[in-house]
Amino acid sequence: MGISKDRIKFNVGGRLFETTATTLANAGRDSFFGALFDDEWNLSPLEDSILFVDRNSDCFAVLLDLLRTGDLNVPANIPERLLHREASFYGLLDHVRTAKWGPFDGNRLRLSDSVKGIAPGDGTAIRAGPDGGCCVAHGSVVHVFDWMLEEHSPINLDYQRVNDVGWIDSDNIVLSACEKLGRGDGGMGLFSSSSGDLRYKFQVCHENQVKSYTAGALSFSPDYEIFASCKGRSNEYGIGVWDQITGKQTDFFYESPGWSLGDADKLQWLNGKNCLLVATLFPRKDNCYISLLDFRDKNMVWSWSDIGSPMAIDEKRVRDAIAMEDSNSICVVNEFEDLGFIDLRMYGGSVRWSSRSKLMKSKMPDEPCYPKLALHEGQLFSSMNDSISVFCGPDWVLTSRLRRSYGGSICDFSIGGDRLFALHSEENVFDVWETPPCPII
């Protein structure tokens, strides 16, 4: 290898390159180039004047420029899959991923890709992974994609319908499923995101007996807890809690008469309040039930329901809910994308609606999907038909809207790994939205 002070030469696939130690050090210790340095980050002397690497030279040029400038410039003649393969060889996949898109900002998102699957439409859920990948549930099958949008082995539950799915980390996925009649099966399982293999099955115990159950909505806490809404054959209706590390059940909050927990559509862990939001919504139930559960003393510390509330002509039914701890409120949305707010400081208070329905009613498609809500770093997102609206500021002003014309209404969306994934209902296709990387000055 040729070393002149801090310069180094490579022959990559017959093409000569010369660069500096400073550029190569940007690759990091765990990369291919990290082995060329000693413990003090000085280049180690080798016998050869030029280091030969039998790899693709065009990709090497792109990756070397990435290390030099921090910018990823890929010529049109280089397939993305090839670049990812070469980056993996050099240990630079994280560098490529960082350069492809910037920190998440709902007002700067651009459509990066659309991925069409082989399953039929009417997907159950899409969930963003922590590293920029995602998983999509269709019936009894969950399709898993890494951040390069390469599909891994699917997870197949053998005709048991998947109700919800969530990422423990980049290697592990939790699935909740319906109980299968005649088999006493169902519940929750931990699966490998790469192989699709079942690693662990979570059990529910009632009076020291293992029970068959249907698991629904999922949520996770920073203290390595898994929460799931549960329905059993006898009294196992409520919210179960499991330890992510051991897989053992640690608690169960039984629903009380006249209130719904086991049929919950949505669970959300509130770290600041150390409580779990549980929302059971129309049309799963005739009425809506939203509550905060404190598992430390098995207490429902706050609740709201539309039971007994007068319905307007347009029947503003709550279709989704999300807690916003910073403002001590819960945001709800109806089928017309009207946003409503409930004050968490008042027990059983009314909904303060912020009407936008006059703008939305004329745009309803033949088969609309119920709107969904998400909150990410101070920005509020609401899906409606084929678009996702972004709201910002203390008054939640509409600041941008994401829309594309293919695939029909959005049935679900998810934010994670600095990406937004939107699943369409009429075609089995999901969109990937990214924030462009910040310009290098």
Curated annotation (Swiss-Prot):
Pathway: Protein modification; protein ubiquitination. GO terms for biological process: protein homooligomerization; protein ubiquitination. It comes from the Eukaryota. Keywords: Ubl conjugation pathway. Residues 6-76 form the BTB domain. It holds the Pfam family BTB_2. The BTB/POZ domain mediates the interaction with some component of ubiquitin ligase complexes. May act as a substrate-specific adapter of an E3 ubiquitin-protein ligase complex (CUL3-RBX1-BTB) which mediates the ubiquitination and subsequent proteasomal degradation of target proteins. This is BTB/POZ domain-containing protein At2g24240. It comes from Arabidopsis thaliana (Mouse-ear cress). The lineage of its organism: Eukaryota, Viridiplantae, Streptophyta, Embryophyta, Tracheophyta.
